[in-house]
Amino acid sequence: QKLKEYKETTKRPIWDYMAHYAASGGYMVSMASDKIYANSNTTTGSIGVIMSGYDMSGLYKKLGIRYVSITSGKNKDSSKFTDEQIAIYQDQINEAYEEFVNIVADGRDMSVEDVKKLADGRTYTAKQAKNNGLIDEISLYPDMKDAMSKKLGTSTFYEMESDEGLLQSLFSKAESLVPKSEAQVLT
């Protein structure tokens, strides 16, 4: 919503480039874009909604742990789903799914029916996404910038800085803990 407001306020176009993985919420945020480009190795799509949890009651019983919950209503505690709670959550999931589908239909100028044919939760390769109208072009990032420069007649771009990803952060921290030599192991 904020990206759409930005476009309306500034009258500036938004072009999106998917470098690696832009699925589910990552795909949804692209719907405000005027053009969507993707690297040939990009995975995208995953148009759908999921809610999950664990029923740990069997494990708790084996371990002798008793779970106690005091609530203000019968549907407040969802540690052990009842059929009624499952129905409540399914309604919420269905509502969120319809909203997601409508956002994609609006963003990609497709009919809701056409989006629903693609919106079963699966991911798509860049080629599949392009063939299905989920993205506009497959290219390398510099090629997208060149196309944008030619189309818009400018070489001034505002690019979002990418924060270090969680996995990258974890791996770099783990790597820093690994000894670099036998001497480090012994000290």
What are these regions (language model features)?
Residues 46:
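Extracytoplasmic ligand-binding site segments that recognize negatively charged/polar headgroups
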Residues 43:
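Short glycine/proline-centered loop/turn elements that form peptide/ligand docking sites
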Residues 1-28, 33-39, 50-187:
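N-terminal organellar transit peptides
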